[in-house]
């Protein structure tokens, strides 16, 4: 077996198996796995912060309802030139095509509503969800691998991703191997997960919002770099949308941490948890 630093990644295809008209796809299975594992992690973390695990389970339903449709809507809007001609594909989420920034926005809105209804701190919930979110992102990126999508520029590095001719951009139709950006981001996200869990357990009295803000900064730094390698970025004119949003995420995260620790003030919040 070749070591990882000399690895050629080749997708076996997007489908796990097919029975008649029923198709089980890797993308859907990975999303489901990310939700289940993330839920279990957040439930476990909640026991350290005097939050009922059942409240986290209830929150998870809200997050799924808010995040997944918004993730798809975000993607479709920035690919409207294509989807306006293929309206029947707008809802085919199992084929791929969701945007994590849309999921984050939808999830935050759902969590804000939930926190007001439950009368708990929004930022306390955000701190419990952030490690699960980045874990889910690390898992979900492998869906891009199986779909042969979200890859980088052509490369001849020892580690590379083979892309079938039908999935290659026209500009690179004669190139077979590309940067495995799915792997870069998955590994980066796992490192961010380690940072967040270390903060959670080493600094149990950290101010509310700290872990989520650190997530915003660290994830966005990685995405800012990795997005520059990709060939299929969502664009708005000459701008890569994900890089613009990542810069905003870094800025908001740094401002929030400055507010908490340099100005020594609390973040605006819903009703504080007891």
UniProtKB/Swiss-Prot annotation:
Highest taxon listed in the record's lineage: Bacteria
A single BP term in Gene Ontology: lipoprotein biosynthetic process
InterPro entries in UniProt: Lgt
Enzyme class (EC, first level): transferase
Transmembrane portions of the chain: 19-39, 59-79, 93-113, 120-140, 181-201, 209-229, 243-263
Cell membrane as UniProt keyword: yes
Residues binding a 1,2-diacyl-sn-glycero-3-phospho-(1'-sn-glycerol), per UniProt: 141
Membrane topology of this protein: Multi-pass membrane protein
Key words of the record: Cell inner membrane, Cell membrane, Membrane, Transferase, Transmembrane, Transmembrane helix
Subcellular location per the Swiss-Prot or TrEMBL entry: Cell inner membrane
GO molecular function terms listed in the Swiss-Prot or TrEMBL record: phosphatidylglycerol-prolipoprotein diacylglyceryl transferase activity
Enzyme Commission code(s) on record: 2.5.1.145
Family designation: Belongs to the Lgt family.
Protein function: Catalyzes the transfer of the diacylglyceryl group from phosphatidylglycerol to the sulfhydryl group of the N-terminal cysteine of a prolipoprotein, the first step in the formation of mature lipoproteins.
HAMAP family membership: Lgt
Protein name: Phosphatidylglycerol--prolipoprotein diacylglyceryl transferase
Biological source species: Acaryochloris marina (strain MBIC 11017)
Gene that produces this protein: lgt
